[in-house]
Amino acid sequence: MLKSFKTEINPTEEQKARIRRTIGTCRYVYNFYLGHNKALHDNGEKFMTGKDFSLWLNNEYIPDNPDKTWIREVYSKAVKKSIEDGCTAFTRFFKHQSDFPKFKKKGKSDVKMYFVRNNPKDCQCERHRLKIPTLGWVRIKEKGYIPTTKDGYMIRSGTVSVKAGRFYVSVLVEIPDVNINNNLNEGIGIDLGLNDFAIISNGKTYRNINKSAGLKKLEKQLIREQRSLSRKYESLKKGESTQRANIQKQKLKVQKLHHKMDNIRTDHINKTIAEIVKTKPSYITIEDLNVKGMMKNRCLSKAVASQKFYEFRTRLKAKCDENGIELRVADRFYPSSKTCHHCGSVRKNLKLSDRIYRCECGYVADRDLNAALNLKDAKTYRIA
């Protein structure tokens, strides 16, 4: 089976420059591919696939434009992958699965340097360092996290990314399949919310990390730094450049704060999932939340975004697959909160402000716990 590992790396200044140059080239080629196909469409010509564009770029465009030879100075597989990503974006657009592909902007779009293992010596890993094509050996900050080549593990591919001035590598490692024993414990239901992050049907509640004093302090600090950055942008009115060193330093401060807050939330999600999976339930049932619809509510959008419900679901799915736990997703319109777990009657007039569920049969329980118990016993679901 294939498993991904992501960790921070500590490249040299020369390696940092090469990574940034490769990422910049990939962004340029991706935008060029989008713009070229847009121009073809406006002229009524046929759409160019990623493979055809790659051949045209290398055999016609670059030879005819000597000032673009710098495209060939970076890792070719990374450039080819950026073209494939553009082709995938167009394919999704044609199938009505997403909007028209957007151009990637420097500093705002997440562009990565892709690498792949072509021969055994291309991608190797030791306890404290990793060998990446065109970069050579790069030191790893978290030693021993990635399985080593010496132990018989093989790296298939990976990406190098830059976030808030820090460099990360994510690799796909081939590891042997593990025999998973069937879990005989009782299944559980999980109700996600804004007041508390997750409520389990066994009575366990996981707090909302966004209400912690540490994150609130960081949010206040972020507001101050963003206000300072806004003042520095006043130079735009005077016609001066926004690429001054002080503006770039302030932008990096804001990025680092965003990154730190994001890491705290992700860490909380990982620890919550690890604790849930350790109980070894036979199945886990969650609800199919309409996050896109919830984000349209301007009063809830910030709170919903900071809870990272989709990330919780994807990480929970991965952990369930690793541990042989069946992940069930209840129907989106299943009335888990409005249904009485004791008698099964549905209370249609239940408001969002009603935190205690009271039924005519005399059943009284916390609203979220009642929903978690109903999810546990749900009969209409699909396997994630």
Regions found by a protein language model. Give the residues of each.
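Stable alpha-helical structural segments in soluble proteins, enriched in small hydrophobic residues
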Residues: 33, 82-93, 369-379
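Long, hydrophobic, amphipathic alpha-helical segments used as structural scaffolds
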Residues: 34-41, 90, 94-101, 175
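Generic detection of short hydrophobic beta-strand segments and adjacent strand-loop junctions
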Residues: 5-9, 138-142, 206-209
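Positively charged, helix-rich recognition surfaces that bind polyanionic ligands
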Residues: 3, 17, 148-151, 163-384
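Gly/serine-rich nucleotide phosphate-binding loop at the start of the catalytic core
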Residues: 1-80
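Acidic carboxylate diad motif detector
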Residues: 52-166
